[in-house]
Amino acid sequence: MSQSTSVLRRNGFTFKQFFVAHDRCAMKVGTDGILLGAWAPVAGVKRCLDIGAGSGLLALMLAQRTDDSVMIDAVELESEAAAQAQENINQSPWAERINVHTADIQQWITQQTVRFDLIISNPPYYQQGVECSTPQREQARYTTTLDHPSLLTCAAECITEEGFFCVVLPEQIGNGFTELALSMGWHLRLRTDVAENEARLPHRVLLAFSPQAGECFSDRLVIRGPDQNYSEAYTALTQAFYLFM
């Protein structure tokens, strides 16, 4: 292994089929993104969109889970993060299927003629408050550059009638996001409440919305069992990705 590769692998996360460097990204690879990338429904999709791609994690997870014919667009506003996402994708088995765009999603959407079967986002959710150490981290954490109404509007403009728009959010913020989405004409179709263990209340929620009305399926996912090892359900969801699972 070359010295440059060794340094790269100390600044990222190694999965079974790909590596994500994230040292130049404001937000690092974490459980939220891994949950969303493993959970989002991919059956029958032909084209996917990752809004706020960051390191490219979600785009890479979707590429692993979908057929070779599926194309994925990853849009990231911050130039350093977009450049690192492109590098991660270039080193993956799916470089020809993922297109990275350094752009403001609100402007990028207006130039598109295609529609997406699956749109995915791990969006900012903090309101403006304590300053972050860098403008890049503030952009990744706060809803100042893309608030939730704007995000929902962008997704609505480019989703297919039967498509899904999937997000992961803290539980309480997710409830507010759901109310907002419903008021804008979206329909909640899938909801998974995520708790660290059986004794704790859910701290994250995975949500899938669609323009098309239909039954909403809800469940609960516990990350760790009584022995503090990963639960069977969490293992089943993520074992295709985690290196030592």
From Swiss-Prot:
Cysteines paired by S-S bonds: none
Primary enzyme class: transferase
Entry EC no(s): 2.1.1.223
Sample GO molecular function, one term: nucleic acid binding
InterPro entries: DNA_methylase_N6_adenine_CS, SAM-dependent_MTases_sf, Small_mtfrase_dom, tRNA_Adenine-N(6)_MTase, tRNA_adenine-N6_MeTrfase
Keywords attached to this entry: Cytoplasm, Methyltransferase, S-adenosyl-L-methionine, Transferase, tRNA processing
The keyword Cytoplasm is assigned to this record: yes
UniProt xrefs under PROSITE patterns: N6_MTASE
Compartments where located: Cytoplasm
Alphabetical list of CDD domains matching this protein: AdoMet_MTases
Organism encoding this protein: Escherichia coli (strain K12)
SUPFAM superfamilies reported for this sequence: S-adenosyl-L-methionine-dependent methyltransferases
Catalytic reaction list: adenosine(37) in tRNA1(Val) + S-adenosyl-L-methionine = N(6)-methyladenosine(37) in tRNA1(Val) + S-adenosyl-L-homocysteine + H(+)
PANTHER family in the cross-refs: TRNA1(VAL) (ADENINE(37)-N6)-METHYLTRANSFERASE
Phenotype upon loss of function: Cells lacking this gene show hypersensitivity to hyperosmotic and, to a lesser extent, oxidative stress.
Family as reported in the entry's similarity comment: Belongs to the methyltransferase superfamily. tRNA (adenine-N(6)-)-methyltransferase family.
Chain's role: Specifically methylates the adenine in position 37 of tRNA(1)(Val) (anticodon cmo5UAC).
GO cellular component: cytoplasm
UniProt keyword GTP-binding, yes or no: no
The protein, known as: tRNA1(Val) (adenine(37)-N6)-methyltransferase
GO biological process: tRNA methylation
